[in-house]
Amino acid sequence: AKITEMAIKKLCIKFLFVSLSFLIIIMNEYILAIESSCDDTSAAVLRGTTVLSNIIANQEVHRQYGGVIPELASRAHQQNIIPVVDAALKHANIAKNQLSAIAFTRGPGLLGSLLVGTSFSKAFALSLDIPLIEVNHTNGHIMALFAQEEGEINEIPQFPFLCLAVSGGHTQIIKVNDYFDLDIIGKTIDDAAGEAFDKIAKIMGLPYPGGPIIDRLAKEGNPNAFSFSKANLPGLNYSFSGLKTSFLYFLRDRLKEDPDFIEKNKADLCASIQKEIIDTLMKKLVKATKETGIKQVAIAGGVSANSGLQNAMHENG
């Protein structure tokens, strides 16, 4: 009886949350959205699904370490969050008392970073006496596909569709049945694709974040210059740790023969490793379309900005 009662309570809470979210969107109310899951402090104001402002404060402090330092990230969030939110409201040309709700990232992400965004959102919502909407970070990547820039009309995916959510922390193939009905049908069992890009860039001595730099250099290189061993998992799951290790050992052996090997072959190395990562992503995604029968596919997350991945998506229709 207790289990049944608890299940009913959870169902009622979910129903109320879904109803609140849809009501706010349909009524074109103003929503403040706050994101602090990693090293960027972000705030946006939306009217329904229209983005009125989107302010991002980057944390340059991590560049010297070649990766995100959690303690430094949380401190920077504390410094940035008030100015960022203030700027978001000003750019949207609204006052705080016009907000109908505050949405914030509840996870996954760095604990200290999440706490800053969560604490600020709760305190701000309490002071304004408006509802809070918790957002899963990965789901947020997907829901961003439905957002529209003011004055623009973008193509919106129709349900059901497959989404390749690929970032520094996640690599997942998600079957999106509805706004609140998402099934993960494939995921990485170790490193995320974005993490692999950044770690490989670090091995090459490139600055952080390395993914965009690899993408830029890859445009000047030969993607077939070098090949690397990669995992061939059954099903729809990914693995990138083996590819990273193969790249590391490949460079180690080449550098013994020529200490300037990386500098001489930088563009080809970037093009080749990017091709391997993208081929791995696309192979599983194409397999997912065949297994599910769903042809409509979208990409979301930070790595979706990669030009090579975008080209591969277009080539596969």
Residue ranges, per PLM feature:
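N-terminal beta-alpha supersecondary unit
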Residues: 29-108, 137, 141
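Glycine-rich beta-strand-to-loop/alpha-helix junction loops that act as flexible
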Residues: 104-107, 124, 167, 298-306
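DPxDG-like acidic metal-binding loop motif
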Residues: 109-128
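Conserved phosphate-binding catalytic cores of ATP/NTP-utilizing and phosphoryl-transfer enzymes
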Residues: 135-161
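Glycine-rich phosphate-binding loop plus the immediately following alpha-helix
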Residues: 177-220, 251-252
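A contiguous, well-structured pocket-lining segment that forms one wall/lid of small-molecule binding clefts
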Residues: 216-297, 307-315
